């Protein structure tokens, strides 16, 4: 967005420690030099605090913007994805200063289009407090939503009043863009020999297991472990090397960066429900094939409402992309044996 919509605008960017290696990315963004200020936010410990006393303290300290200093700029627009005590606190603080700020949201990958401003219990509590105080809730202050495919957002969310703003198409084959992404994420091209790349999730470690590791081992038996490499989710602690399956050593580099900056022609990208390669394949032709395999564990996923919703969302989004003549080589498989013919 800084290279397109906000190319000539003065922009600050805040990055939280929810992402692996965020502190290093902050330093590289400073080196990139296109932002006025690049700020690192330590928010993970606050958002995921366990003790009730800490949650209450954080709710009122951060949720009402007491952590923001008086020299904070009067921003014309704040753009964010997802609600937390930090975004609510910034909203409350700038409103208290009578700053006429426009509040906007943006997509976080193509599978986020069916979700409007996710937020936890703390945000709901702040919403209630703001209502009692007679103040507009932050989610009701949103005016715009930035995304690559406005038609998909309008299709998923017909009831909101947001102005849908298209993020301009971009030439991701441009050498300069690859150089910027490689700089910011400290990316060096990897010569992957394996034909099949599996993207794991963190479901086993987030309390919603459905047998993903067992699926990986079955795939290794079908295609050969020597032909399979694993791109692990940052929170996935499963060990695959004991089964002679190679794990990609990417040091926290998102797959999206790899696919945008590398040649993945001829590869077969496999996942239960990750949207990583779908998001990139929708905006850049890569000559790779992709398969979702959630139908094969649908009975185990059915007890989790979030997975039922996600599986339906994947089907809907993929059908719509196919109708747009995009992602024609990305399919939903109902049996693993079909991998041998892809």
Question: Model regions: which residues?
Answer:
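Structural motif
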Residues: 76-79, 102, 195-196, 267-270
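Active-site and donor-binding regions of nucleotide-sugar-utilizing enzymes
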Residues: 1-136, 276-277
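Catalytic binding pocket for nucleotide-activated donors in carbohydrate/polymer assembly enzymes
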Residues: 276-342
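Conserved catalytic-core segment of nucleotide-activated headgroup transferases in glycan assembly
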Residues: 176-186, 191-236
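Short His-Asn-centered micro-motif
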Residues: 1, 14-17, 80-83, 106-107, ...
């Amino acid at each position: 967005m800084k290279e397109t919509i906000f190319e000539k605008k003065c922009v600050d960017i805040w990055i939280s420690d929810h992402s692996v290696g965020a502190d290093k990315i902050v330093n590289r963004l400073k080196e990139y030099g296109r932002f006025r200020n690049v700020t690192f936010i330590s928010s993970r410990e606050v958002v995921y605090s366990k003790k009730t006393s800490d949650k209450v303290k954080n709710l009122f300290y951060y949720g009402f913007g007491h952590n923001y200093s008086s020299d904070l700029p009067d921003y014309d627009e704040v753009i964010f994805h997802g609600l937390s005590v930090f975004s609510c606190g910034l909203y409350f603080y700038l409103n208290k200063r009578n700053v006429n700020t426009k509040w906007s949201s943006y997509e976080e990958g193509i599978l986020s289009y069916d979700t409007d401003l996710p937020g936890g219990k703390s945000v709901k509590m702040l919403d209630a407090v703001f209502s009692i105080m007679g103040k507009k809730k932050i989610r009701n202050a949103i005016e715009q939503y930035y995304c690559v495919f406005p038609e998909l957002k309008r299709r998923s969310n017909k009831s909101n009043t947001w102005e849908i703003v298209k993020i301009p198409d971009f030439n991701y084959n441009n050498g300069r863009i690859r150089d910027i992404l490689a700089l910011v994420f400290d990316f060096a091209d990897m010569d992957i020999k394996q034909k099949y790349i599996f993207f794991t999730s963190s479901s086993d470690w987030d309390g919603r297991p459905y047998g993903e590791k067992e699926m990986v081992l079955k795939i290794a038996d079908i295609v050969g472990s020597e032909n399979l490499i694993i791109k692990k989710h940052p929170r996935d602690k499963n060990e695959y090397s004991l089964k002679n399956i190679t794990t990609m050593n990417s040091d926290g580099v998102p797959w999206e960066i790899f696919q945008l900056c590398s040649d993945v022609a001829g590869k077969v990208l496999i996942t239960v429900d990750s949207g990583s390669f779908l998001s990139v394949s929708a905006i850049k032709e890569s000559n790779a094939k992709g398969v979702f395999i959630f139908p094969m564990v649908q009975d185990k996923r059915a007890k989790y409402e979030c997975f039922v919703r996600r599986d339906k969302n994947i089907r809907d989004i993929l059908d719509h992309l196919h109708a747009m003549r995009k992602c024609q080589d990305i399919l939903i498989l109902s049996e693993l044996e079909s991998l041998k013919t892809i």
